[in-house]
């Protein structure tokens, strides 16, 4: 569920207005700083913002129902030839992320052959969890489940949970009582020494060719929104704490320490490392997939 207002459906265009770019936004708490920043800087007025889960936003982008937006890393890698990556903006971590977790009733090494529930809202976190368990020699019996911890644990020995439900399990002791909590961001960092990127911001290649000025405008607005939100993190956390079941200190730890909104050389190295370890015919993208950025550069 979105934590801020979202466009429910397409709005019929008014003939005398120029169409604004249709921009997909993740409706999780992890994107709240960017949403706050867009409102504070006025960038929100320059786009038609549509909020949903990473999976739904990515599907709409690939279908042409959005011009640009957030897309889970796995879906971007599978469709890299159709998309252009916007530099210096991403959603990731460089250590514990707090909102992408494996919650288990037993040590991870005991999950071999055991039922493990995979949340249905993000393919990237699911694939990362599978990689991390395989690295430990564990091959569970996976099944997909709605992102509800109680439902997951009623049917499984462990569950992969992301987004707001995962953050709630992390910060609310009663929700994770008796469960072992493993942070996917921290596990990846210990394994590779690199940051992990869960979602990137991309534009459709045909839209970039048709409206390069709009793409640059949205890119500039996102960077300004991020920087404004980070410079006013105390205000963002205090506002969010007034209507969320978390204290401002917990939100500050999440927004400013856990989440990483950058896409620089180390983050790109993390993406290419993930592609190298996860890529192949079965995944729908090659291990050496090329990342094409808006500034014309490529990374591999």
Describe the role of every protein-language-model region.
Residues 44-56:
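A short beta-strand-loop structural module common to alpha/beta enzyme folds
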Residues 15-40, 51, 98-157, 162-168, ...:
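Bilobed "Venus flytrap"/periplasmic-binding protein-like clamshell domains
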Residues 209-277:
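Secondary-structure end/capping motifs
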Residues 268, 274-300:
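Long, low-complexity C-terminal extensions of enzymes
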Residues 61-62, 151-154, 278:
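Hydrophobic residues within well-ordered alpha-helices
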Residues 29-30, 53-54, 65-82, 87-89, ...:
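Beta->alpha turn/N-cap motifs
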Residues 83-104:
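N-terminal short beta-loop-beta anion/metal-coordinating cradle
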Residues 144-240:
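Pocket-lining segment of extracytoplasmic ligand-binding domains
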